[in-house]
Amino acid sequence: LILLAESANRTKKGGQDLIGGLDVRVNRNHFGRQTESFQAPLDLPFLATEGQGQPAPFNGVFIRAPVVEKILPNQEGIQIEESNKEETVVAPSREAKDQVAKEAMEKHVEILARLPGRAARLATTGVDIDAEKEVGDIVAVRQGNVFGTSFHPELTEDPRIHCWWLRQVQEAVNKRRNAQSLPLR
């Protein structure tokens, strides 16, 4: 998620380079150090298969995990406003190589998952908090053909995210093949 973000804070200039692709600002190590790593069940509706209904929760493994702090505007070139923030790095500008890539880059960021926040967790302990008003931390996003998570799906025995992503890649390959086989106008 950090590598694919257009902007990352809590980092030093010359530290982590970004390649971009997701119009988001991430907050690095949002949950703390490695010793504060944890696992949490996540509702991931995008994993539902046709006719299945709500899928079972996915066990997210969060290790020094970032969160999406802000969805940034989709714009050409670098995120100039972000580059002026202290302790923030931005990805270099990139150009689409063809129409399919251009369409993917122009899409807006979709929020695919949130981790319920502190208020939601406290509400289950009898503390008088309106958990409905807190939406939680953004932990999975997609923009066009770029997908990023705060958690490590590869560290679980649950293959659903990998299967879903392989289907997304296959659809993108088919779309590119179809676009290349269409006659030029």
Locate predicted features.
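Cysteine-nucleophile active-site neighborhood
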Residues: 1-48
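Amide-donor transfer/coupling interface in amidating biosynthetic enzymes
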Residues: 28-35, 40-185
